[in-house]
């Protein structure tokens, strides 16, 4: 029997009530491959400005008896500059590092690749699409010529993917924690040394945010949010 819209809404809201920023994970409990794939797929399917998907997700296995040599190396190297991830590194099963592309603009090879190869736009429409994106960057969001602002715009897109992954994780009972507590310059250097920021023929990457996944080893905490009337303004 098909679920009613209200039933689905209640399940989603119940999952949000259950979810918390997990500060302590149980190192003996692992996320199944199926659940991990579902979470990552939710991120991959996230919407993005102009549909440009300016992201990449690095999946670091934190289990010493499962992880690749590179994952174990990253686990060790990231501990010092990622003060907000240390509890996760000590117990979570996975750390997902969300990268954002740098210098994405209408003339970049990456945008042309997305238009032609991924979106498969008609050839006569590609100039119109590129012109619209250029106008957006130059005249609407004042991004043109500002590398940091353009990178921050790309980072904003990764947070949409992050939100999708957080929601999927909560819906299937996997605990998570979004992470911004890290030294961006130091993490970029580590990832660059590992060859993980190289965009190949397209734009290179920089770190945006992180997400840990596993199962909590902590008591539930009361969710505290501002009252709806202080947040929602119905016009």
Task: Describe each model-derived feature in a short phrase.
Residues 2-235:
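Acidic, surface-exposed loops and disordered segments
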């Amino acid at each position: 029997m098909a679920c009613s819209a209200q039933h689905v809404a209640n399940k989603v809201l119940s999952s949000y009530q259950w979810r918390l920023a997990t500060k302590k994970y149980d190192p003996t409990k692992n996320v199944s491959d199926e659940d991990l794939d579902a979470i990552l797929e939710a991120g991959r399917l996230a919407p993005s400005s102009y549909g440009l998907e300016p992201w990449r997700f690095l999946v670091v296995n934190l289990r010493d008896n499962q992880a690749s040599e590179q994952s174990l190396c990253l686990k060790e190297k990231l501990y010092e500059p990622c003060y907000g991830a240390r509890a996760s590194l000590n117990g979570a099963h996975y750390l997902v590092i969300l990268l954002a592309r740098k210098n994405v603009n209408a003339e970049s090879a990456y945008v042309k690749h997305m238009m032609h190869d991924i979106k498969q736009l008609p050839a006569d429409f590609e100039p119109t699409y590129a012109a619209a994106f250029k106008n957006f960057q130059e005249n609407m969001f004042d991004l043109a010529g500002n590398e940091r602002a353009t990178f921050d715009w790309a980072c904003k897109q990764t947070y949409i993917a992050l939100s999708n992954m957080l929601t999927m994780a909560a819906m299937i009972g996997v605990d998570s924690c979004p992470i911004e507590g890290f030294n961006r310059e130091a993490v970029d250097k580590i990832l660059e040394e590992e060859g993980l920021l190289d965009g190949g023929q397209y734009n290179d990457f920089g770190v945006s945010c992180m997400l840990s996944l596993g199962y909590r080893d902590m008591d539930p905490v009361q969710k505290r949010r501002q009252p709806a009337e202080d947040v929602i303004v119905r016009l």
